[in-house]
């Protein structure tokens, strides 16, 4: 399902490959205090079971550092080998040096070049973290963020901009500084001897247009696999739409090797929502398939009944319910496309484009529902049992279409 991808080295984070021709990986991050081993382990398991292929956790103090090996041990005891990424700011060099078991337990280090200190201390702290990564054979994500830019670098670029015949806006210079911060750290790590197969790069902002510009620049200036994400995307529909709007143009250009959707969860929503949204973005773009899809129309004046809406909802629920068993028994079932349409205008055509689809009668239409499979009329359903009959047909189709080859 992959389109043309920007060529990069492959970086292994644990057993998960990032970059090259490998599928775009979905990441997430815990929001529990890492020092709370029980809560953090439970959330990592929850995120992983929802589909997160890599999970990041903050390592912000000594108690968090001490907790990491035990979190890893408990995950392995559950048979879960999801890679863990340590997120370091301000004191990462100290923690990695003092707690070697923590460093060994992590599968990748995230280093923010804007939170390493100032002046020569910044370079020393960065070099120490890179040396530890090299000694342990760990990959590193150099992750810059416009909310924590190095003020010295920003001042340097602002001064340079002021001497231009036609200075750029302050906002443009901030974006340039963000890219420069990431690229300089990337080049410094390479000069220290960290291999290209151990480096991932990111530079995050909170506006969609800015993110597209920044990542096009990173793609132009480096060969590194890129971690995409709109930082502080926000809550609910706004956060989902902003993330999709920011990531889609880049992904369609072949830019991006792993993604995270940084939603602010509402108190009523699970942390796994960000994983679900990331998967939906990749699936909507045709880049990966995680679960069967249901295509359904929005309804109009021709669809006076809510039956097609109820059926679409029930089909979606049933597919989600059956997916764990289907995935184990029927390879490729994630590619399944089901159509539930509300009237004769687009119903038959959309149903023919799906693997299996039903075109329900609209207002004033004859009370019958043709079902199509692989583009051909399979049967016509009538009466009160249309919903259950269609669900049975979907089940039969899966068993036939996706049965393992003998």
Curated annotation (Swiss-Prot):
[4Fe-4S] cluster binds at residues 297, 300, 343, 350. It catalyses: (2E)-4-hydroxy-3-methylbut-2-enyl diphosphate + oxidized [flavodoxin] + H2O + 2 H(+) = 2-C-methyl-D-erythritol 2,4-cyclic diphosphate + reduced [flavodoxin]. Converts 2C-methyl-D-erythritol 2,4-cyclodiphosphate (ME-2,4cPP) into 1-hydroxy-2-methyl-2-(E)-butenyl 4-diphosphate. Keywords: 4Fe-4S, Iron, Iron-sulfur, Isoprene biosynthesis, Metal-binding, Oxidoreductase. It holds the Pfam family GcpE. Its cofactor is [4Fe-4S] cluster. Binds 1 [4Fe-4S] cluster. It comes from the Bacteria. Pathway: Isoprenoid biosynthesis; isopentenyl diphosphate biosynthesis via DXP pathway; isopentenyl diphosphate from 1-deoxy-D-xylulose 5-phosphate: step 5/6. One of its GO terms (molecular function) is iron ion binding. Its EC number is 1.17.7.3. Optimum pH is 7.5. Optimum temperature is 55 degrees Celsius. SUPFAM superfamilies: Dihydropteroate synthetase-like (SSF51717), Nitrite and sulphite reductase 4Fe-4S domain-like (SSF56014). One of its GO terms (biological process) is terpenoid biosynthetic process. Belongs to the IspG family. This is 4-hydroxy-3-methylbut-2-en-1-yl diphosphate synthase (flavodoxin).
């Amino acid at each position: 399902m992959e389109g043309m991808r920007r060529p990069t080295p492959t970086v292994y984070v644990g057993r998960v490959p990032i970059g090259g021709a490998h599928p775009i990986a979905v990441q997430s991050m815990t929001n529990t205090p890492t020092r709370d081993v029980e809560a953090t382990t439970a959330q990592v398991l929850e995120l992983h079971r929802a589909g997160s292929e890599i999970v990041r956790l903050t390592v912000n103090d000594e108690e968090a550092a001490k907790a990491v090996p035990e979190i890893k041990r408990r995950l392995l005891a559950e048979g879960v080998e999801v890679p863990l990424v340590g997120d370091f700011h301000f004191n990462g060099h100290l923690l990695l040096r003092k707690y070697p078991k923590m460093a060994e337990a992590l599968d990748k280090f995230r280093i923010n070049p804007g939170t390493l200190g100032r002046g020569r201390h910044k370079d020393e702290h960065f070099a120490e973290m890179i040396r530890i990564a090299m000694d342990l054979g760990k990959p590193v994500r150099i992750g810059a963020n416009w909310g924590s830019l190095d003020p010295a670098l920003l001042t340097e670029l602002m001064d340079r901009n002021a001497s231009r015949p036609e200075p750029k806006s302050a906002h443009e210079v901030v974006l340039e500084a963000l890219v420069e911060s990431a690229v300089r750290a990337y080049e410094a790590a390479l000069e220290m001897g960290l291999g290209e197969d151990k480096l991932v790069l990111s530079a995050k902002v909170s506006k969609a247009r800015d993110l597209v510009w920044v990542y096009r620049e990173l793609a132009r200036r480096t060969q590194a696999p890129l971690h995409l994400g709109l930082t502080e995307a926000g809550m609910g529909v706004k956060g989902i739409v902003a993330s999709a709007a920011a990531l889609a143009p880049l992904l369609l250009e072949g830019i991006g090797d792993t993604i995270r959707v940084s939603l602010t969860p509402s108190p009523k929503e699970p942390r796994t929502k960000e994983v679900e949204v990331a998967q939906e973005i990749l699936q909507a773009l045709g880049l990966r398939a995680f679960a069967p899809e249901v295509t359904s129309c929005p309804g109009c004046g021709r669809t006076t009944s809510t039956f097609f809406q109820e059926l679409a909802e029930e089909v979606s629920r049933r597919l989600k319910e059956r997916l764990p068993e289907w995935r184990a028994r029927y390879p490729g079932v994630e590619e399944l496309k089901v159509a539930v349409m509300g009237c004769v205008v687009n119903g038959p055509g959309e149903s023919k484009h799906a693997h299996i689809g039903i075109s329900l009668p609209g207002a004033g239409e004859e009370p019958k529902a043709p079902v199509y499979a692989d583009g051909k009329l399979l049967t016509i359903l009538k009466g009160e049992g249309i919903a259950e009959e269609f669900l049975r047909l979907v089940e039969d189709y899966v068993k036939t279409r996706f049965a393992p080859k003998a």
